[in-house]
Amino acid sequence: MNKQTAHYHLPGLFEFYELYRIFLPLFREHREYFYDGCDIGSIYGAPPDCIWGGGRVSLEDHDAGEVLALLQEYGISARLTFSNSKLIEEHLSDRKCNELCALFAENTEPENGVIVHSELLLQYLKSHYPQLYLISSTTKVLTDFEALKKETDREDFRYVVPDFRLNKAYEKLNTLTESQKDKVEFLCNECCYFGCKDRKECYEAVSRRNLGEEPDFSCTSPGAEEGYRFSKAMKNPGFISVGDIQKIYLPMGFSNYKIEGRGLGSALVLEFLLYYMTKPEYQLQVREEIYLDNMLDLF
């Protein structure tokens, strides 16, 4: 990948198929609408009822074959979000998750990947689906810089997503080697309370829900009842703006940027695409192209 290019890893592989069905042709046919030096590195997600799933509970679904066909048409990598941290041996035989991995492994141009947390699942995927590259999930909550370094040194992972609270540790981040920097994928637009001490427990609760359990957990962070708001995320100390990417991170040698949003609506994800990828003078045109498509229900 070109290091002077910001590679965005976008949410909603299954959830926002209809949005991407409209957006991707615009991105290809009207490059003048979009910033120079940005592209789509991957789109990630998982269908509902995937017990290997984690990070967020998926509510929307779309046919996996159609999803893959769309991304192949545009040369974009598809990633399965299988970041459940609570898997045990008996879960590895799950038919739906294995069928998805087998389908994604069939397509090698471009390569597809899996976002993973569980070491048990990691070893299983390496053994059964070696065609799929692996991403270390942000659900590991890597807030310790030395732990991040060790994770980037692991040959198992092509990319590593640290906790968003390491985003502004510029001096430490700049000590990483070129190969380590190539692996780091920053989570840009997290809205979670910066001082949250329960982030790992929150992700574990999602993992348990995907396994059919009812964990006794509720978020008590300040402002949690408001839900996700992009305006609030922009005020987060860990927020990475489009200006930060262009003026700080790319010059430092970092190229990969994850945009969260799987559990949100299409309209808000569109705002992310406009903010991070679209030149301000063309944002209204892109928004109109999307809104005026009668096949897309944004709200």
Residue ranges and their predicted role:
Residues M1-A147, E151, F157-F299:
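Active-site pocket-lining/capping segments in soluble small-molecule metabolic enzymes
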